[in-house]
C-alpha cells in the first residue's frame, strides 16, 4: 500500500486524564466521523488502534485507543498522525479534495508562471489555506483555498491554477 492509498484523518494531541485516554484532533469534516472508519494506524502502519470517543474536550475529542491504558502510554503518542485506507473514506463531491491529494501539486498563476508547490493545507476555522513553497527565486505564500483564488485543481495533471489576491503574487 502506498502513502497515497492512506489519508491522515487525525492526530493524537496528548494524554487526557490519568487512565490512558487521549485528546484527539480530528481532521474530518464531521469530527466524530473519525471513530467510524475502523482501526486507524500510524503513518508507518506499525501500530493500529480502535477508537472509542468519550466526550468533547477543549481542542478536540476525548478518546480511548485500544491497547493504551496508562497516561504514560498516551503521552508517548503525542503528535502521532492517524491514518485510514482511502477505500474506507466516503466519496467526495465535485470540487472537494482530500488535503493529502493537494500536497505536492504544482501551483501556477493564471498567466502560467510557476509559483511553487503545495507544501501543506491549514485550517484555522475560517477555511482552508494552501501553504505554497516558493519556486526558485520566489518566496512562499499562503493562498485561501476558495474558488476565486484557486479556480482550477487538476489532480490528473498534478497542478493548481491560482489567481492570488493583489499583493500576494
Curated annotation (Swiss-Prot):
Coiled coil: none annotated. InterPro entries: PRC_barrel-like_sf (IPR011033), PRC_RimM (IPR056792), RimM (IPR011961), RimM_N (IPR002676), RimM_N_sf (IPR036976), Transl_B-barrel_sf (IPR009000). One of its GO terms (biological process) is ribosomal small subunit biogenesis. Keywords: Chaperone, Cytoplasm, Ribosome biogenesis, rRNA processing. Gene3D superfamilies: PRC-barrel domain, RimM. Residues 94-168 form the PRC barrel domain. Pfam families: PRC_RimM, RimM. GO terms for cellular component: cytoplasm; ribosome. Belongs to the RimM family. An accessory protein needed during the final step in the assembly of 30S ribosomal subunit, possibly for assembly of the head region. Essential for efficient processing of 16S rRNA. May be needed both before and after RbfA during the maturation of 16S rRNA. It has affinity for free ribosomal 30S subunits but not for 70S ribosomes. The PRC barrel domain binds ribosomal protein uS19. This is Ribosome maturation factor RimM. It comes from Cereibacter sphaeroides (strain ATCC 17023 / DSM 158 / JCM 6121 / CCUG 31486 / LMG 2827 / NBRC 12203 / NCIMB 8253 / ATH 2.4.1.) (Rhodobacter sphaeroides).
Amino acid at each position: 500500500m502506498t502513502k497515497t492509498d492512506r489519508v491522515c484523518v487525525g492526530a493524537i494531541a496528548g494524554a487526557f486524564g490519568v487512565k490512558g485516554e487521549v485528546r484527539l484532533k480530528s481532521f474530518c469534516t464531521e469530527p466524530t466521523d473519525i471513530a467510524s472508519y475502523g482501526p486507524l494506524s500510524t503513518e508507518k502502519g506499525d501500530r493500529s488502534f480502535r477508537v472509542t470517543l468519550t466526550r468533547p474536550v477543549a481542542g478536540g475529542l476525548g478518546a480511548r485507543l485500544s491497547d493504551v491504558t496508562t497516561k504514560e502510554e498516551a503521552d508517548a503518542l503525542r503528535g502521532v498522525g492517524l491514518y485510514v485506507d482511502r477505500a474506507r473514506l466516503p466519496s467526495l463531491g465535485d470540487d472537494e479534495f482530500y488535503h493529502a491529494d493537494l500536497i505536492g501539486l504544482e501551483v501556477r498563476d493564471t498567466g502560467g508562471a510557476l509559483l511553487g508547490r503545495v507544501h501543506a493545507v491549514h485550517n484555522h476555522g475560517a477555511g482552508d489555506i494552501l501553504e505554497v513553497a516558493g519556486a526558485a527565486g520566489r518566496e512562499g505564500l499562503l493562498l485561501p483555498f476558495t474558488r476565486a483564488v484557486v479556480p482550477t485543481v487538476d489532480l490528473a495533471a498534478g497542478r493548481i491554477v491560482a489567481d492570488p489576491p493583489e499583493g500576494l503574487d
